[in-house]
């Protein structure tokens, strides 16, 4: 080969490597060098307009919705009233101011130390049509308030859908920035990875901060479902205050459709939405072998049908892989318990929060380790999920700024900034993912990548290989892919 041709090939190859690194960063480990201005974690004052109560004291407030069944044809509408419980009823329909359906709900309340909640209402709207805009009204007369939501497309492997991912939000000015940035995105449903109001950070676990947070996020969650994951700040275990029942506020305020997925607890459950099967786990409930959560997950993974919902996504609070000094190794026990299943069932993505920073891993696993093998480091594994920490919502505890000095080989991108992520499922084979920081005032992604679906990527390859190789050889190749 002529010298000039060899050089041309070399420079062409070099150009493509540089291009790939600059576009999707899948070949380059990166600790972001972005220098932030000072963004102190300052709470929004309780009398701010961001927490404003409705003008009519009888009006519902803190309105929020979540998916109400397994397949996205139901919505749970929740709200709070204070002066009068009123009627726990929602009227709804497909035209504004024309409500031809109604649903009756239930009312509850709770006490925590010296705080007594308002009347908390939960109402199930079921038998909805897919891909339809519904308008709904809560309250009567002058106290009534109206909202809307859009149901997801029918379950289908090529159903396109966009999720937002937010964690550790709180109620600071940084929290507001995250929420405003997200609401300008194309997100249709939020996957919330735990730590909601941070009410436990206030004196005596001030319950009014649950109320202010409910009013704060209403601007989004009254119009699109947020899929809830429990975090450590929802535990609120305070025996010094006489409070020994964990998750009291969370369980009373934020229902989940756990019964639809045969779960025994609202803290772990699963849903199907568009082309995704989403599994929600609790980092702060027992999960070792033979516990209810372990048994449930072992069954739920067998029910996943990748022919219908090719994208398998897991939500939890404490990350299984984390190179930040904050909360280092806190997810290790759950990793040991569940990681082999994640690899076996080819989970696509695992989202977590807890660490107040952002980090994305490569596809790696550490399932071959045992005390005598010496294989103690994570290795590339194309059957493994990508692990993403999005604990950078903006809460009052501030950012986790100290990453390990040397970035581990498994870590693809990390940065200590406030922000949120979006995941656009395009079809059964590809999804567009991006993380957006708040701090630079720009609405452009900082970290982005195109994900190939774990199940369909391997099955497409399997079909191709079967044309030229025997079945056993094909399965060996696929397992190593």
Swiss-Prot record:
In this protein, the residues bearing a glycan are 109, 206, 370, 427
Q: What are the TM regions of this chain, as residue ranges?
A: none
| SUPFAM superfamilies (UniProt xref) | Metallo-dependent phosphatases (SSF56300), Purple acid phosphatase, N-terminal domain (SSF49363)
Protein's UniProt name:
Phosphoenolpyruvate phosphatase
Q: What does this protein do?
A: Phosphoenolpyruvate phosphatase that probably operates in the vacuole to release phosphate from phosphoenolpyruvate (PEP) under phosphorus starvation.
Q: State the reactions this protein catalyses.
A: phosphoenolpyruvate + H2O = pyruvate + phosphate
| Ligand binding (Zn(2+)) | 195, 232, 317, 354
Keyword Lyase in annotation: no
Q: Between which residues do disulfide bridges form?
A: none
Query: What EC number(s) are associated with this protein in UniProt?
Result: 3.1.3.60
Which residues does the annotation say bind substrate? 232, 354-356
Top-level EC class as recorded in UniProt = hydrolase
Q: Does the UniProt entry include the keyword Protease?
A: no
Q: For this UniProt record, give its keywords in alphabetical order, as a comma-separated list.
A: Glycoprotein, Hydrolase, Iron, Metal-binding, Protein phosphatase, Signal, Vacuole, Zinc
Question: How is activity affected by pH?
Answer: Optimum pH is 7.
Q: Name one GO molecular function term.
A: phosphoenolpyruvate phosphatase activity
Q: Which InterPro entries match?
A: Calcineurin-like_PHP_ApaH, Metallo-depent_PP-like, MPP_PAP, PPA-like, Purple_acid_Pase-like_N, Purple_acid_Pase_N, Purple_acid_PPase_C_dom
Would you tell me the Gene Ontology cellular component terms? vacuolar lumen
Give the record's family classification. Belongs to the metallophosphoesterase superfamily. Purple acid phosphatase family.
Instruction: Give the residues the record marks as binding Fe cation.
Output: 168, 195, 198, 356
Subcellular location per the Swiss-Prot or TrEMBL entry? Vacuole lumen
Q: Which Pfam families match?
A: Metallophos (PF00149), Metallophos_C (PF14008), Pur_ac_phosph_N (PF16656)
Stretch forming the signal peptide: 1-36
- PANTHER family per record: ACID PHOSPHATASE RELATED, BIFUNCTIONAL PURPLE ACID PHOSPHATASE 26
List of catalytic residues: 327
